[in-house]
Structure formats: C-alpha cells, structure tokens
Swiss-Prot record:
It is an enzyme of class 1 (oxidoreductase). It comes from the Bacteria. One of its GO terms (cellular component) is glycerol-3-phosphate dehydrogenase (FAD) complex. Pfam families: FAD_binding_2 (PF00890). This is Anaerobic glycerol-3-phosphate dehydrogenase subunit B. Belongs to the anaerobic G-3-P dehydrogenase subunit B family. Its cofactor is FMN. GO terms for molecular function: glycerol-3-phosphate dehydrogenase (quinone) activity. Composed of a catalytic GlpA/B dimer and of membrane bound GlpC. It catalyses: a quinone + sn-glycerol 3-phosphate = dihydroxyacetone phosphate + a quinol.
Amino acid sequence: MKFDCAIVGGGLAGLLCGLALNQYGLRSVIISRGQSALHFSSASLDLLSALPNGDKVTDVAQGLQQLAEQLPEHPYSRLGAGAVLEYATQTEALLAACGANMQGEARQPHLRVTPLGTLRPAWLSPEEVLLAPFAQQHVCLVGISGFADFQPHLAAAALGQHGVTAAAVEIELPLLDVLRDNPTEFRAANIARVLDDENLWPALHAALLPLAQQHDLLIMPACFGLADDRLYRWLQTRLPCPLRLLPTLPPSVPGMRLHSQLQRQFIREGGTWLAGDEVVKISHRQGAVEAVWTRNHGDVALRPRFTVLASGSFFSNGLVATRDSVREPILGLDLQQTLPRESWYQRDFFVSQPWQRFGVKTDALLRPVLGGQPFHNLFAIGSLIGGFDAIQLGCGGGVCAVTALHAARQIHALAGDRP
C-alpha cells in the first residue's frame, strides 16, 4: 500500500499533521492502536503557560523569547517564536474547520476553571468552558445524584475564594437509572450516550429550569455532547441564565468529542485511518524509511514516501522504560536524555521531574536521529520529542500542534509536485 505519508499515532499531533497534509493535497494514512491521550484530556490546549524559572507567561510572544534563552533545547526555541505563533494560528483555523468551537487566541493565555474550581492558564478551551474573570456573581454548581466524577461542593468552595457566591446542588435524573445498577457504568461518557437521545432532553431541561431561575449562571459536569454540542446549544436557548460545563475525571467527554471531530474531518478529506493496528517494524536503509509493517497487515507493508512518528511518550508507549533504561521501541532512536536511573526523578513530587523531559533527539527539521545521523524522510512530532516538561511549562498541546504543522510543511516542501 503506497501513501505519501504514514503517521504512527492517532492522537492530537498525528491528527493535526494528517489534516495539514490533506490541505497540501498529500495522501496520508494514520495507524492508531487505540484511544489517544485526548480521551483523558479536558480538550483545553495550552501553548506556553510558564517559564523554566517559574515566571508565569502573560504575553506569549515575549515568553517565547525568554524561553529560547532559558531552554534552548525546547522545540519552540529551535523553531523560533515567529514560526510557533504562525503554526498556532494555523491550528486555530484547522480546529474551526473541524467544527471544534474553541475560545482563546495564541498571543495571550486565558484562565479556565478546572473541575475543582481552580484557575488554570490555557491557549484554547471549548466554548462551553467557564473562563475567568467572572461576569456572574450568583453561581450554581449542579451535580448529578450518584455521579462521583464531579464534586460540586469542592468546586463551589474554590470559586468562593474568587469572590463568587457559589452554591452546590445535586439533581435527580431518573432517566439515568439504567446506569445506576453498576457504579462503574455511571461515568460521563456513558451518561453522554444516554443523553444523545433527544427525547430525554426535556427531562434534563425540567430539572435545570428551577435552578436557572434562581441564579446568574449554572455550571454542570461535561457529561453530554459526545458527538456534538447540540444539547448544549438547545439548553442555552431555553434556560433563563447561561450554562457552562466543566470536564470530569477521565474518560473526558470534551476530549473524546475533540478527537472524534478531528478524526472525522481527516477521513472526510480523504485520509486513511487504520484503527486498532500497531506498527511493529519500520524498515530503513541508508537513512531512509522504506516500509512500515503493522500487526494487522502482516506481510503487506505500507510503503510511504515519508513517515511521521506521533507515537507519544510513556503514556502511549512511544517511549518505554525498563528498570535501568529508556528506549524508543520501534527503531531504537537516539534519546535526548540518558541519565542514570537515580537521576530520573526528584523526591519532591510537585517539582519538575527529569523523566518528563525524556524524548527522541531531532534535528532542526524534526527528523529523528539514529546513531548520530538524522533520517531523510522520517519526522518525529508531539510528546515523543525530548527537551521539555509539558506539565511544568504548560505547553503540551502547543508542542503537539506546532511540531505537527512544522513536520507537515517540511514534508510538503520535500514532496514537491512528484506523484
């Protein structure tokens, strides 16, 4: 099977790279083993929230310049501030084209409300997520009786520290009794599947209406809208006060919806999606990838002109750790960090952990290195790349997006007009 590009990994980085390649008119295939980290994500993306010295970033352009001085090995520092902001703006357009309605812009982070009622900086957030500062003063956090993945009382107490009068209430929804027999089934994703039935929407509206008549704002757990935001918009037009949603413990409905929107758009535009498959081998010679072998296709190899590794970090097995070493499992690529095991972590759990910065070495074009030599037609993107701590710096989503679009641009330039 011949493709212009084979992308290993179907998470945020892989999908954005595939969407960008579609726009360039290149034929690509994504090999996805299963659920990506987006299924466990709030669907809010961060670009750059903090610097290595601990300073908060309020102006991203200025923050990128300071980052280049403090952490020159960061992917942003290597690409340059101008390119990062350009790719971020392009990402916003790609997400909008997929039907993902987001709020925020690249140059200035906003503060979103977390499930615990705290404030966290972000670059983009789904439009139903509550942002600070708050225009409303009398807020009601609405939980669902028996639903343990959202604690309205904790969120209300935290919001109260920001000068908001916040009440916590739980509503009874008998329409969800079908899920209550098994506590493991009473999760946000399963509730969302039940509420996909439009015949049940009036019952939810009836439960929320008395609360909406008494408060300036309702905040619910994001437990509906798995495929789209129709129910959210339906409620918005019928309740007398605004409604906002907060992500729950994983699996996350907003994250699952964002993944589905990107995946559907990729396929709609002509991309090929190999679900439930896994790359077991990549054949290469003299620095060029020749074939990609997958578990499900056996002896039938994919033969792409270019290959992109978007296989993630430890969470997605893009990196694998043994008792005394870390390796990239498909090709055994060179890693940016090779610290002895006793230096992998800090005893203080809340400080930046060295293992978070582990990842593959790449050159300026994001081509990974094997034995000190970069590949000619292989690129690495997203959290597989080393040199940064996404949690400490608040840059995980941004690195995925920026490196994905940078790799797509390099592939387009190298592909030229060849068939």
